[in-house]
Every structure is written in C-alpha cells, then in structure tokens.
C-alpha cells in the first residue's frame, strides 16, 4: 500500500515529505526533485518569495545510488529564509515577553477565506501564526516532491505520463472546448509559458487580466486541468465507493489549498446534455481493438480507468491574502479591523496546475500498486504485462 505524509511550516527550518510502499528499483535523483520544485515556482503573477525561494532538497532515506530501495523515502526541503525566522518559529520556549514583541507579536486579525479564525478556535490559539504557517500553500512543495517520485515510477513501470495546463485565470483564457489537449511532449512548452498554456491568444488574455488585478491590489483564481496518458483500463473499482478511482482523484485534488471544485472529464457540462450526446460510443478500431468516438467521461467509467486519457479539472478560488486587505474583526478587542496581509501572489493558478499534477500522479501510483502490487518495479511491471495479456483478443 502506498502512503504519504508531509510535515513542516511555511517559515520553519524545513519541510519533510515521506512516502512508504514505493517498490524498489525506481530510478530517482535529488536533481529530479529539484527540477519538479522549480516547475512549481513558475508562473506570471507570483509574489516576491518565488524570486529568492530556492528549494534545498535532500533525499534522506529510501534511495541508494539513484534507485529506490523499497523502504520509506524521506525528502527534506530546506527553507532558505530560515535565519530570519529562527526566533518567530523557534521550537524551544522563548521568554514570554520576547515571544509577544515585534515580529513575534500575535496575529489577531484573521483573514477571510483562510483557515485563520476557525483554526484558532479549533486548536485553542490566540494567534493566527500557528494556523497560517501549516495551512500555507508552501506545504504543497512537499507534495510536488513526492509526486515526482510517483511520476518516475508510473513512467518506468507502465509508460504512464501526465501533463497539466491552465484553462483560464480570472475568467479569461481558452475560449473553445475544441482546443486540442496538450500531450506529454508539450511539457517544456507549457513550462515556458507564463500562464501554462499552449494557446498564445489565451496567454495574452490571461496575462492582461493578471496585470489588471495587480494594478487594483487584487487576486485571481482560475481553472486548471491535468491529463494522464497511458493508464491501463481497470484501475479502481465499482465494487466499493471508497475505492473508485474518480472519487480518489477528486479527493486528492480537492485537498489542495484554495481548490473549490473538481470535475472528471466533461463533468458539469454533462449535466446539460441528453444521454444520447453524453456518453462515449464504442466502435471496432482499425487495429482490431475497441475504439471510442469521444472521451467525455474523462477516461473513467464506473469508478475505473477505461484506457482513455484521464482528465481532471479543478477550480481555484482567488488567493485570500489580498494586498488591500479585507474587513475582519480583531479577536483581542472585538472591534472591526483590516485583515493581516502576509506576502502572497496575485495568482498562483499555474503553480496549482503543477501541484494538481502531483496529486494525480500520487493517486494513480497508489491505485496502480493496489491493483498490481510488487515489491520491486520489475515485479509490478510483470504483473501489469500479465494482466493486459490476459484480456480476450476481442476485448482489447
């Protein structure tokens, strides 16, 4: 069983990510992780932190000579700003007065749209600092690191590859649902785009919308999509609701900070179509295999992958750390106030696409291993090959 967990605070000394259940023999290096984290820092509209944030990666356990060992993998991502925060984020006790002065002073004006107020209520804090430190999207660096390990496993074991792109930012973006989907070979071109799209007209519209938001000291959300190619049919199951692949993918992507909606395939568009135009008809293919005339289901039927590309879309709300600050209540006085304004981005939609890609990779790896098992990548590969070879010829 593949399991993962992350630890660490936004301005703490380091983030730590762990993954257990990865088979031995997966080729992975520290540079692979660094390259993945660099992709997360890309995107027009990012804040000042992205300019100096250099993720210091250490593969602590589970990898030897560039190959996984089958034991738990631990990854440390150091914080280059840590020297500035050693007192504010000290794990050891500070003098009471010192702990409440200057930068250490409690943050008592919770931000609307953040975890601040409810987190303070839930965990008994009189300060938003402990809440915002862990709820910060900085934590997603850990998931991107783990997602890269999962990506390498998926490609090496079964040729599965993923790609992510941005559909829209602030309502501006790709204007046609018939725009060709990007493929795995388009990753470099997408990384080079300031807003992670292959559509140059849409790129101009999105950049202009971000510039407008910056000028107004505002923030923007958007819509992203992840596509997975090469996933064999039969991953996931219809027999229990909690083991359905679409449910797992939706939960994984919904768990990303600021994501407020997820759909598989055409999702909400399907609700407005008659049944005769909503499903993916099957015909005999030229190669003797079954072919589909469309992919409205997004590669998943009955909770299982059906062999077509898997498409997952997500809606990201605007970042709630707004430069001009929203109205709130100061919890120390009970009086109206302006919310605290932590350094943030105008938009992080392109980065969210990279994070969503990581979560799709982790979920696919988890369900692939649930189906095929294997202590080594060679064993998993043999199991997959045997499964595919077992299909009757007329059902391939």
Swiss-Prot record:
It is an enzyme of class 4 (lyase). Keywords: Amino-acid biosynthesis, Aromatic amino acid biosynthesis, FAD, Flavoprotein, FMN, Lyase, NADP. FMN binds at residues 134-136, 257-258, 302, 317-321, 343. Pathway: Metabolic intermediate biosynthesis; chorismate biosynthesis; chorismate from D-erythrose 4-phosphate and phosphoenolpyruvate: step 7/7. GO terms for biological process: amino acid biosynthetic process; aromatic amino acid family biosynthetic process; chorismate biosynthetic process. Its cofactor is FMNH2. Reduced FMN (FMNH(2)). NADP(+) binds at residues 40, 46. GO terms for cellular component: cytosol. The keyword DNA-binding does not apply. One of its GO terms (molecular function) is chorismate synthase activity. The keyword Translocase does not apply. It catalyses: 5-O-(1-carboxyvinyl)-3-phosphoshikimate = chorismate + phosphate. Its EC number is 4.2.3.5. This reaction introduces a second double bond into the aromatic ring system. Homotetramer. Belongs to the chorismate synthase family. NCBIfam families: aroC (TIGR00033), PRK05382.1 (NF003793). This is Chorismate synthase. It comes from Bifidobacterium animalis subsp. lactis (strain AD011).
